[in-house]
Amino acid sequence: MSDNSKTRVVVGMSGGVDSSVTALLLKEQGYDVIGIFMKNWDDTDENGVCTATEDYKDVVAVADQIGIPYYSVNFEKEYWDRVFEYXXAEYRAGRTPNPDVMCNKEIKFKAFLDYAMTLGADYVATGHYARVARDEDGTVHMLRGVDNGKDQTYFLSQLSQEQLQKTMFPLGHLEKPEVRKLAEEAGLSTAKKKDSTGICFIGEKNFKNFLSNYLPAQPGRMMTVDGRDMGEHAGLMYYTIGQRGGLGIGGQHGGDNAPWFVVGKDLSKNILYVGQGFYHDSLMSTSLEASQVHFTREMPEEFTLECTAKFRYRQPDSKVTVHVKGDKAEVIFAEPQRAITPGQAVVFYDGEECLGGGLIDNAYRDGQVCQYI
């Protein structure tokens, strides 16, 4: 049996149950474990309590319980520059960004990884639900987490081979209830702490209120595709393609009580397009264009790939054909897809393996660009 005590693993600890159990398992496996709390956002909740302070207390309690050293490191500047500014620019451009994808790429597996290396780390570990498999030649494959409902490879799809080679995901083979059970059996103080939800820098706060602090809203007209005026929208950045709630129009227009959905945007005219029906024609597309396309393993500059893809988190895989050229790709769907949203990630899979992904620029319906931005 290999001597793990000579291998130093630096664990990103958030104060949640997943990262707590990650540290616990590595410690039990004999690794030299250090816990790091990342402070990425200067945050107070509606009661004036700094949530990061509360989370750090949980990290300290768990680290003391399992007997590992811990540090707190501040990445607020890196986070602002590399994640928040990106997200704000995407919202201004009428797109719907996925800050968690960028946070993993730029903070958790770049700024944090670099910092861990200064502590003499051989690996970093996080509480993500994903797996890594290592070939004899050293190539690392990123595989889906065993818990299908919790699998987080979608958010990890921009990680590079170099980043993955330095990464461990100890929870990848576990299901969430097993993780909670391990925390309870070990008496960890975070065993019953509820999971955090929402965008990493917004947390539980009201999204609309948060965004309006940083980006001035520009109300405009809400219209149907055939030109009927449906009232005013609050600002295009507050709406995403395919969204149902928050339109304030119900079934009052005409006799049809079918629900209304956001079916398009025109940034240049500041118009929000709405339509009735979950599968409204304007919501359906047959292909997309992506940029910032990246693979977790070395691939040719130009190639075609038959695989499956996800266009949003927790969506079932769909069969696609991907034509890759440099960091751009055309993705053709085997079946029409609903609400393909510019700014979101498209992520490619070959069975269990996450191959990588890109950011959606445009959706197309039979060769015609969809009016989504």
UniProtKB/Swiss-Prot annotation:
GO terms, biological process: tRNA wobble position uridine thiolation
The record's region (Interaction with tRNA) falls at 150-152, 312-313
Q: Which chemical reaction does it catalyze?
A: S-sulfanyl-L-cysteinyl-[protein] + uridine(34) in tRNA + AH2 + ATP = 2-thiouridine(34) in tRNA + L-cysteinyl-[protein] + A + AMP + diphosphate + H(+)
Q: Does the keyword Lyase apply?
A: no
Q: Can you tell me which residues bind ATP?
A: 12-19, 38, 127
First-level EC class:
transferase
Q: Which GO terms describe its molecular function?
A: ATP binding; tRNA binding; tRNA-uridine 2-sulfurtransferase activity
Purpose: Catalyzes the 2-thiolation of uridine at the wobble position (U34) of tRNA, leading to the formation of s(2)U34.
Record-given protein name: tRNA-specific 2-thiouridylase MnmA
